[in-house]
From Swiss-Prot:
It comes from Streptococcus gordonii (strain Challis / ATCC 35105 / BCRC 15272 / CH1 / DL1 / V288). GO terms for biological process: fatty acid biosynthetic process; malonyl-CoA biosynthetic process. The gene is accA. One of its GO terms (molecular function) is carboxyl- or carbamoyltransferase activity. Residues 1-236 form the CoA carboxyltransferase C-terminal domain. Acetyl-CoA carboxylase is a heterohexamer composed of biotin carboxyl carrier protein (AccB), biotin carboxylase (AccC) and two subunits each of ACCase subunit alpha (AccA) and ACCase subunit beta (AccD). This is Acetyl-coenzyme A carboxylase carboxyl transferase subunit alpha. Its EC number is 2.1.3.15.
Amino acid sequence: MTKITRIVREARDQTRLTALDFAKAIFDDFIQLHGDRSFRDDGAVIGGIGSLDGRPVTVIGIQKGKNLQDNLKRNFGQPHPEGYRKALRLMKQAEKFGRPIVTFINTAGAYPGVGAEERGQGEAIARNLMEMSDLKVPIIAIIIGEGGSGGALALGVANRVWMLENSIYAVLSPEGFASILWKDGSRAMEAAELMKITSHELLQMEIVDKVIEETGLSNQDLITSIKQELLVELEQLSSWSVEELVDQRYQRFRKY
């Protein structure tokens, strides 16, 4: 098995810790909030409020299931527009009350179904990109599995973007890339090599700011590592002025 094949499989592994696992383990007294106040609740996006060392934080994540029944509830981690609108509602609420935002990203992409398109999938993603770029609070985004296309970026316009070591981040799946370029989806891992989708490759290109190592760590050790990184980073970002937060976020993404 090649290194890229192993990383892609690890990123997609159904046994990986989910957004909800991290939210409950890292943040004290995590309380979920539901619904976009327009259509319905989307099980693919979780969000709520928790406490990190006494600091209130808004936590949002894209949630995959751990078995078939759970995956059906979570739509296999592919959000509908109401999921992105729920996320935006919680982010605007965080801004209103001065809470920093932490997002956990794990999706192959936004759901491409007819109903999702009819309800404005593209608009929901675009609005999140626009609104996140101007939020007046610190934002940290962590890719914990797959970071697929605009569906991931809709929660990823942050002051700091981190990746777990065995996660991937790309404009589309390796299978999609291979199908478009070579009309042969079986060449997916060859495509993945060309796409430069791994954490260390993206760190080298300055697409992400930090790689959180996983090798040799238990789940609890990984949770502890992320919690410590968040404590340090939020302490630093919280000392910035609103103008510094917004300008740094803008410049971070403009440089691409």
